[in-house]
């Protein structure tokens, strides 16, 4: 039966088709301008940029100039890059400009499509960020596309790991900036830990185009970026607790692979309590007494380390370190760590050096970072399966852009075997058969362990002519993938390794030329070699086409259909022929954890012999249903996490905006005075309730508060004895006394040093309280889930209590700032300034506990200091000569304060 929706779509077309159709008149208008634009000289074409900027300054919008701007960008691309965007690529550029995701298949030129929207939006002068998944792609794309942007008079910058603040600031100041999502997020967090506006590197969040948008905004969405500092070493405790786990039997714990959780049974808990008592680690009677919370946390981590985390699948051991493996790409992530002590538990399990834990100093999720942009767009080959999530969370619609040429790839039905061994034997035979007919083969595996198992089995079968691409061989990744289209080539790759590098039949000509011509001087010999390479690649392409194009063999289905589609999409680029097939077994993770019992019983009834497979469209549909369930569950998890993170995000925005205002303010005296007066009002009215009799006043408590908080020794007892005195009189007298102290300090220190002190005290107090607040919210979030058992909504409870904690933070800020300002003194000799903790940047997945430490180098002192401008000084050591040029040490000059 045809649905009403289906009938409507036949008559009116889908929203996707309408969006594509709606842009075709603009494409026609751009094409109509082509001849006149072509007639312009290079200088005249480049001058169009200033002309467009002038039109925007006069009130025109970007939409008003889209048609001529796209026409100019297309012609400039032809001249600078030798590439002319197709009509469908123009449509892709329009979709990116319209705050949407352009779904474009592999090989359709997404990088070139982005240049159209980038050029148009860069004309506003507010900056455009092009976001990639790794430094290699950011550097590669920036280097190539800078030729185009430079031709048009625009500047291009790139941010990669290891750059200092000056280099980053310069790159962000460019019209177009290429960077990874990690670098952008960490720079935002680091900027909001700076003490001078001039030290910040970013200049706002205007427009971002996210390449591989599904990877960044979905796969990594629930993974916060965290900057942290190390805590005390507790390696002995991890080692002691790790030794308990091998003593347990299967009845002592329960493992849930679906939820990735591990818990102890009653029997296991009793056994652990005895072990902990013997080790002197158990306090009180029960393991679950309040004082044992930390020990329970350590034990749970140790259990997960042994029972949920697999070596060579989730991590590898290298150079005395645990190195995490990205579950989506199979790549190593050196320097990244699991959070909440999980990484230390793995280090104890594998008997490597246990690194100290870390305290969160600042954090943000990608969901909330990218929602800060005024305009956001994305590109990928596979977004449709996550269309609801993109719309729900980011307000981004997914538009499928037609391919320039029809897709000729044949996607075959899955083959299902009973065991791993049978499946791998069938794959090996298929690889050999394909290689014998010169068909290039890309084999996708889900883990290092599986890729190396397949490689070993291939060698044992006598077949050795293949390449293995997994986390262990990360350095050669791009080149190995680029040559996977050579006739007869067999490439085994973990999951989506090499994503972002095109697999061209015959091999990637650009990468071949770059590699083979490296170091050769320009001249006849180099030209001859280049020509020979081009002819060789052309002949190889014809041979690969004749063999049927790239054959993608998948050894397992991923729990996300999108990852499967990405693997399939490596074949059949730009109208090339191709083929894809999934080989499965009942022992695969997806089949074992999520597959239905019905499928298992059906295969048993069929009585399959060893080595036989079943192939039926019904199996594909059953697996797709299982994948949809997993995707829906993961979406719900991400959506729920976002609701909690939004609470923190709202508070983060208030604090970060407040910091910027404080850095920008010329005079903070009024702010400090208001804080002090509000605090005095609160203190007095706490100890002298409104309309209370004098004998009900807490005079002793008020006296203690005045001394302890305000550092004032006032005759409170005498005042209280005065006839007819009221609380308002006390408030005014205390304010007057405090104001006199501060006025005397200002006169003694001088206005310049006082302004420096005020700003430093305010920012340091906010930062310290904010770090404590993050820890408090983490603790609240970890316990609030249990409120559901009492029929209370955990989210509403979290919101209410988080608000109370935030109000307490603001009150503590008033008290902390006032207490420090009332005590601050310039001294002749100050104790050495405590060093800041070494800071690390990393990701943390709240579900798996995964961290991704991408080293954050802390606050880098600018090298060029202007003596007259303290904002350029950065962090100055107390024993350094003062940058102001006075000839005194910093601690005796501008740094001469003891808070």
Swiss-Prot record:
Its cofactor is Zn(2+). Keywords: ATP-binding, Cell inner membrane, Cell membrane, Cytoplasm, Membrane, Metal-binding, Nucleotide-binding, Protein transport, Translocase, Translocation, Transport, Zinc. It is a peripheral membrane protein. Zn(2+) binds at residues 882, 884, 893-894. The keyword Ubl conjugation does not apply. It holds the Pfam family SecA_PP_bind. One of its GO terms (molecular function) is protein-exporting ATPase activity. GO terms for cellular component: cell envelope Sec protein transport complex; cytosol; plasma membrane. InterPro entries: Helicase_ATP-bd, Helicase_C-like, P-loop_NTPase, Rhodanese-like_dom, SEC_C_motif, SecA, SecA_CS, SecA_DEAD. One of its GO terms (biological process) is protein targeting. It comes from the Bacteria. Its EC number is 7.4.2.8. The keyword Metal-binding applies. It catalyses: ATP + H2O + cellular proteinSide 1 = ADP + phosphate + cellular proteinSide 2. May bind 1 zinc ion per subunit. It is found in: Cell inner membrane; Cytoplasm. It is an enzyme of class 7 (translocase). ATP binds at residues 89, 107-111, 502. Monomer and homodimer. Part of the essential Sec protein translocation apparatus which comprises SecA, SecYEG and auxiliary proteins SecDF-YajC and YidC. Belongs to the SecA family. Part of the Sec protein translocase complex. Interacts with the SecYEG preprotein conducting channel. Has a central role in coupling the hydrolysis of ATP to the transfer of proteins into and across the cell membrane, serving both as a receptor for the preprotein-SecB complex and as an ATP-driven molecular motor driving the stepwise translocation of polypeptide chains across the membrane. This is Protein translocase subunit SecA. It comes from Allorhizobium ampelinum (strain ATCC BAA-846 / DSM 112012 / S4) (Agrobacterium vitis (strain S4)). The gene is secA.
